Amino acid sequence: MFSQKTNYSHLFTFSIIFYVEIVTGILGNGFIALVNIMDWLKRRRISTADQILTALALTRLIYVWSVLICILLLFLCPHLSMRPEMFTAIGVIWVVDNHFSIWLATCLGVFYFLKIASFSNSLFLYLKWRVKKVVLMIILISLIFLMLNISSLGMYDHFSIDVYEGNMSYNLVDSTHFPRIFLFTNSSKVFLIANSSHVFLPINSLFMLIPFTVSLVAFFVLFLSLWKHHKKMQVNAKGPRDASTMAHTKALQIGFSFLLLYAIYLLFIITGILNLDLMRCIVILLFDHISGAVFSISHSFVLILGNSKLRQATLSVLPCLRCRSKDMDTVVF
């Protein structure tokens, strides 16, 4: 079934997009980590925001390299990739990387919210004065969700492998006894790997909704803070572009970009779960898989554009790259 619908041009397109993602992911996240680490070594200190940014960039670097290694193992050692132990290990690695990528981005949004927003509420002031502890507590609480997620995925993964190995000719797509996400078939090994993450989608998406909800609440409360601040400025007859308003606006722009990318990512996951006919199309399958990497890579470049230090470092690097490119052209010609 899979081999009849698969077009090699789709696989070629996927390969091109995949390698572009790998290169841009390494460059973007590597740049964030390098700039912050060099600044840390130079100043002998690092801010909480830069700590979160650096950890986020390193996590996404690990994610990109793990995806690259898994794909290389698939093509170079397919017999090794088909082992249940390797199948489980790949799933756990992707879940852990995705978990920390999303939760660290959520922590960054909560940090900006507590630092920039202004309320007279006693609970808010208590959290604002202890923002570092709040971020640390969020990370620790997220570890509980991670353990639950891995445990749940372990049960699903073990079940799917047992079914696949126990009845090699059985097509789970046509079965009403199993969830529609089990799309394993014996027609192609590539199809097995391409659909392996869909075993995890229903449970994993539920855990992904938790940080999304936290980020959404922080975004709307920050927007409420900006609205109250704007009304206060109108009463005091001050200009609309004061420092607090600009800080609110920049944080809201970054938060909105994150939520938009996050919502698109979740939309593709939910679409993959609910639409069986859609999932039979290899183009949608491949696009669904690369959407996760696109989300993290796009958000990394949003962070670069939204951070003054990273943006300034980018502007200082670009002239050097142009000069090096001109030198290479001179050598060639």
From Swiss-Prot:
Coiled coil: none annotated. Expressed in subsets of taste receptor cells of the tongue and palate epithelium and exclusively in gustducin-positive cells. Expressed in the antrum and fundus (part of the stomach), duodenum and in gastric endocrine cells. Its main location: membrane. Glycans are attached at residues 167, 186, 195. It is a multi-pass membrane protein. Keywords: G-protein coupled receptor, Glycoprotein, Membrane, Receptor, Sensory transduction, Taste, Transducer, Transmembrane, Transmembrane helix. One of its GO terms (molecular function) is taste receptor activity. The keyword Iron does not apply. One of its GO terms (cellular component) is membrane. Residues 38-57, 115-133, 228-250, 306-333 are cytoplasmic. Residues 1-14, 78-91, 157-204, 274-282 are extracellular. Gustducin-coupled receptor implicated in the perception of bitter compounds in the oral cavity and the gastrointestinal tract. Signals through PLCB2 and the calcium-regulated cation channel TRPM5. Belongs to the G-protein coupled receptor T2R family. This is Taste receptor type 2 member 123. It comes from Rattus norvegicus. The gene is Tas2r123.
